[in-house]
UniProtKB/Swiss-Prot annotation:
Pfam families: Metallophos, NadN_nucleosid_C. This is Uncharacterized protein C1039.02. Its main location: membrane. The keyword rRNA-binding does not apply. InterPro entries: 5'-Nucleotdase_C_sf, 5_nucleotidase/apyrase, Calcineurin-like_PHP_ApaH, Metallo-depent_PP-like, Nucleosidase_C, Pesterase_C1039, YHR202W_N. It comes from Schizosaccharomyces pombe (strain 972 / ATCC 24843). Keywords: Membrane, Signal. The keyword S-adenosyl-L-methionine does not apply.
Length: 601
């Protein structure tokens, strides 16, 4: 498949202009050796089965420093093809689904212009049956346009974006992807699929996201759910499967019309492994993030399927329901199993019942070569410096000496974010903990690690000059108190030794038994104070803040002074580089370069 707009090269100086010369270093495995002798639990196949990925965020080349999740998408393709073969051998159905967010998080996706064109192309090699859109496909108009023009057509109507539209070249609104698709599985299950994005409002102005509750009232949706030729409603979406009204509303709208028809939900966005119950014939699965997890779901007891009943799984019993109350109860319960597969070659081989020599397919091997070539084209082995020790995101307290957040507050923010014209003015710097996507590990640090740590190229540090300190000093508590700390489960990154998942069916979903690792919550807000006199507080300070906080900062200051004094006209970019590389990811790269470039010797 030819994907237009794929560049032949991006220009080293353009991407990596932080230092004048570079040395390429091969990736080093910095984690302890994976215990391949630990127990891997087999999959249970039903009449209808699903392989699910979500929130891959560009990690298609694998976690090069972590054996637990080291498989690349070439090995995943071999896994997918072998699983399709197994499904045919067993005489059952297998569908592959992805629920969005294909970039923002890895050099393979983010070092291209626009972001995602390499990883989008890699995705087209995979035998996905249904896909849907994520919010990260919509933040930037260039990404939305490229995805809509070159990626969506490849899927021939199976890329669904039921509540997302885009302005075309004639400035007319059209569907970003399909509203729905109808198909009959190999074993006779008449399936109607729809794909939704959560009620997202931070999209670029070339796209429109219709709230799910509004989409439900539309004529096309009502026509679809009133069809009488449907054995299974397949709802996929970039929406967390737990505690979201979007899913509850969609489920209720169908269940009121079809009391007994199975409704299968596959979600995403919250970056966790999860399985949630809606009713006796409706469950939901979320398959993690960052190519750390392949989600697996099987359904048995489908009367519409001509596949042989497998007699696996368990019915929904007394689990807490995610659905709205007082809905019709399905008369015939179904039987379900779920697994969360660690994204590595060993587990893929185990589940496909292949040896080391027999596992790879020619197509998978070829895709691994393509991925390696793309990494070379993007020069992802370039090195800014070498980190002398690990700095952790969630494994230690944010106040610990080896916490990445303490490193940011004590060193990165005050030492990198320098404005020569204002450096003598006392200032506070406000940043967000949620912008950090992982730990900094000992060893080489290049563009790949930079984007893994912080992929937000549209985040800049702005400032308001000469704010009375009596107001500025209150901003931290106001911003930090605006919402509770993020759920630590949202940040289960590549922890050692692995995931321990608890969901509505219990704690046996992980295919590999891991040791539980306690984690610390990620702080909402980080603050550094720079240039303060130790004996007295300043009268005024510069307030430096990530543009992510801009609206909230202005609102908070105006509320404190009880009038609208501070507006966008008071805001100026604080950290500015001549080469234009002054968005938040490059803050980390510059710090590594200026502090640790000599550690590579």
């Amino acid at each position: 498949m030819k994907l237009s707009s794929l560049p032949s090269g991006l220009g080293l100086a353009s991407l990596l202009g932080l230092i004048s010369s570079a040395t390429a270093y091969s990736a080093t495995d910095l984690t302890t050796m994976y215990d391949w002798n630990q127990i891997i639990k087999p999959l249970e196949w039903g009449q209808l089965n699903f392989i699910h990925t979500t929130d891959t965020h560009g990690w298609l080349g694998g976690h090069l420093r972590d054996a637990r999740y080291k498989a690349d998408f070439g090995e995943f393709k071999s896994f997918a093809l072998r699983m399709k073969e197994l499904a045919d051998f067993k005489g059952v159905d297998l569908l592959m689904v992805d629920t969005g967010d294909l970039h923002d998080g890895n050099g393979l996706s983010d070092a291209s212009d626009p972001q995602g064109i390499y990883t989008n192309n890699i995705f087209t090699y995979l035998p996905y049956d249904i896909l849907t859109i994520g919010n990260h496909e919509l933040y930037q108009a260039a990404i939305s346009n490229n995805t809509h023009e070159y990626f969506v057509p490849h899927w021939n109507g199976t890329y669904l974006a039921s509540n997302v539209q885009i302005y075309n070249s004639s400035n007319e609104l059209e569907q970003f992807g399909g509203e729905s698709t109808y198909f009959i599985t190999k074993h006779g299950v008449r399936t109607l699929a729809m794909g939704f994005l959560f009620n997202f409002s931070s999209n670029a102005n070339n796209t429109v996201v219709t709230p799910v509750e509004t989409a439900i009232k539309s004529e096309w949706y009502q026509q679809q759910i009133n069809r009488t030729d449907v054995d299974l409603f397949l709802l996929i979406g970039h929406i967390p499967v737990r505690d979201y009204d979007e899913w509850k509303s969609l489920h209720a709208s169908i269940r009121k019309v079809h009391p007994n028809t199975p409704i299968q939900i596959l979600g995403g966005h919250s970056h966790i492994r999860d399985f949630a119950v809606y009713d006796e014939a409706s469950v939901s699965l979320e398959g993690g993030r960052y190519c750390e997890t392949v989600g697996w779901l099987s359904i048995d007891g489908l009367s519409a399927s001509n596949a042989t009943r497998q007699y696996v799984g368990r019915p929904v019993t007394n689990e807490t329901r995610q659905s709205y109350p007082n809905l019709p109860k399905p008369a015939t319960p179904l039987y379900y199993t779920r697994r969360y597969i660690d994204f590595n070659r060993q587990n893929f081989r185990f589940h496909t019942q292949q040896s080391e020599d027999s596992f790879d397919t020619p197509e998978g091997v070829e895709l691994s070569k393509v991925i390696k070539q793309y990494r070379d084209d993007l020069n992802l082995s370039y090195v800014f410096g070498c980190i002398p020790k690990n700095y952790y995101m969630t494994e230690v307290s944010p106040q610990a000496e080896d916490s990445i957040f303490k490193l940011m507050v004590d060193h990165i923010l005050p030492e990198v974010l320098v404005n020569e014209n204002r450096s003598s003015v006392p200032h506070i710097i406000i940043s967000n903990g949620g912008g950090v996507r992982g730990s900094m590990y000992e060893g080489t640090f290049g563009p790949d690690e930079m984007f893994q740590l912080n992929p937000f190229l549209t985040n800049y540090y702005n400032y308001i000059p000469d704010v009375p300190y009596k107001y500025a000093k209150k901003l931290y508590s106001i911003l930090n108190g605006g919402s509770t700390l993020r759920n630590v489960n949202d940040y289960l990154a590549a922890l050692n030794p692995g995931y321990v998942t608890s969901d509505d069916f219990g704690e046996d979903g992980d295919d590999t038994v891991h040791t539980y690792v306690s984690t610390y919550a990620v702080p909402n807000v980080l603050q550094a104070q720079v240039g303060f006199n130790t004996t007295s507080a300043p009268e005024t300070v510069d307030v430096v803040f990530l543009n992510y906080f801009q609206t909230k900062v202005l609102k908070a200051l105006n509320t404190m002074v009880n009038e609208t004094i501070y507006t966008l006209s008071n805001v100026t970019q604080y950290w500015v580089r001549e080469d234009g590389k002054d968005s938040s990811p490059y803050m980390f790269a510059q710090y590594v370069q200026q502090e640790w470039s000599d550690y590579c010797d």
